[in-house]
Curated annotation (Swiss-Prot):
Protein name: GPI-anchor transamidase component PIGS
Native organism: Bos taurus
Ranges in the topological domain labelled Cytoplasmic: 2-18, 533-555
Keywords: Endoplasmic reticulum, Glycoprotein, GPI-anchor biosynthesis, Membrane, Transmembrane, Transmembrane helix
GO cellular component: GPI-anchor transamidase complex
Matches recorded under InterPro entries: PtdIno-glycan_biosynth_class_S
Subunit note: Heteropentamer. Part of the GPI-anchor transamidase complex, consisting of PIGK, PIGT, PIGS, PIGU and GAA1.
Membrane topology: Multi-pass membrane protein
Positions of a cardiolipin binding: R15, R18
Stretches in topological domain Lumenal: 40-517
Described function: Component of the glycosylphosphatidylinositol-anchor (GPI-anchor) transamidase (GPI-T) complex that catalyzes the formation of the linkage between a proprotein and a GPI-anchor and participates in GPI anchored protein biosynthesis.
Amino acid sequence: MAATGAAATDLEVVRGKRAALFFATVVIVLGLPLWWKTTETYRAPLPYSQISGLNSLKLRLMVPVTVVFTQESVPLDDQEKLPFTVVHEREIPLKYKLKIKCRFQKAYRRALDHEEAALSLGNIQEAEAMLAEPSEQAEGSLTVYVISERCSLLPQDMMSYIGPKRMAVVRGITHREAFNIIGRRIIQVVQAMSLTEDVLAAALADHLPEDKWSSDKRRPLKSSLGYEITFSLLNPDPKSHDVHWDIEGAVRRYVQPFLSALSAAGNFSVDSQILYYAVLGVNPRFDSASSSYYLAAHSLPHVINPVESRLGSSAASLYPVLNFLLYVPELAHSPLYIQDKDGAPVATNAFHSPRWGGIMVYNVDPKAYNGSQLPVRVEVDMMRVMEVFLAQLRLLFGIAQPQLPPKCLFFGPKSEGIMTWELDRLLWARSVENLATATTTLTSLAQLLGKISNIVIKDDVASEVYRAVAAVQKAAEELSSGHLASAFAASQEAVTSSERAFFDPSLLHLLYFPDDQKFAIYIPLFLPMAVPILLSLFKIFLETRKSWKKPEKTD
């Protein structure tokens, strides 16, 4: 009986050892790999090497320029050399990781018969009408006509002319170095019409050191797919003023042509509103010398915040909102004028705030109060108001007056409020800005993934990253080829895809699941099972080790 009990005990011990080994094998062979696979952070492969290469991206902005020479514009020997091509390239000195070079590719040729006839006229406007911009002329390209030194098309004291279209006129010279002298004049003109250091600096203002550029360079709006424009009439004293403004007609006559010409840069929506009892929030000061009130320049920044609370929240808007306010001061503070930093009245009686909008103070004619009962009827001169708002709108989009070369004839924009080459220059700047933004976003995403290991990257997010990288590369290629329209479209796609990937909500799913929380969940689950298995394995190890050291019996 004792032998039978001992045998049963030994069998039970062996069975326990086998069970412990079996459980340990299952945990190690199946459990740990399965747990590791099911709890790992999924990351679709990303083009890290290509993203890293974007930091050293070199942009070459090519501007195609067609230079047309009329008869007697250059010596006969030089005319026989036509046609040929000259390339002028220079680097834009910006302290930024993107290296930008501007390349002017000038294709010289002789004038055709209809061009000779148009340029032989005595009026530049008539000549420009005959030299209507060909429909096949691409965005970003320019045409420069070189006329003879004695041609009466331009005033004799003028050496060049810049028109509203993609056209310019330069006076020639009969000199043995004619091509070199005229070439320098052409470069001055095309730089004024296309790309300058200031234009690109304003576009990259958010990416450059703050002490590098003044606040004026940060005035333009950031590039966006769309913009919302709101015109507001502020009447703080409706008991004294019955204000009427034809905002619909003004938008149709003055604003809509400008926005239609600017449609290539984004989509626009326009609305208007009238706000009663809306005050500026800053008490004007009284000037006894002129019996008027004024707002000093240092108080203008404090005007916006109190008014903005009445304008309606723009938080729900997907696009930047531009506010243009027409303020009719109350009777107790009339007339009201805005002063500049030197204390002089501002001619337009208006001011603007970068990336926000503008405010214009509209004073009621004092004669309206003579013999009239309150409230007096006020008819707003919308032409005068819209001239100010359009000028502010141009500044907010970074469309400033060009830096004209010496002795250059320039008439300014027509009824559209913007010249064709100004739109091209805006698209150049927006393309560079979009590429800089997309590159920064992709680089930040790659750095973030390197620092935080539990960020999930799904396949759709990875596809957006690949799409953004490809769009950046395509935009850079199109810019170097002088294809402005396709380059701008590709740059917009790059920004959209990169930001869609960076701000995808799925990246945050495991971001707030640190390691201490993992241990708090796994220990109660695995510890009760792991302790018996580990103790059994340890006991088996000790017994096995003891059996190895036990000496064998000898007869």
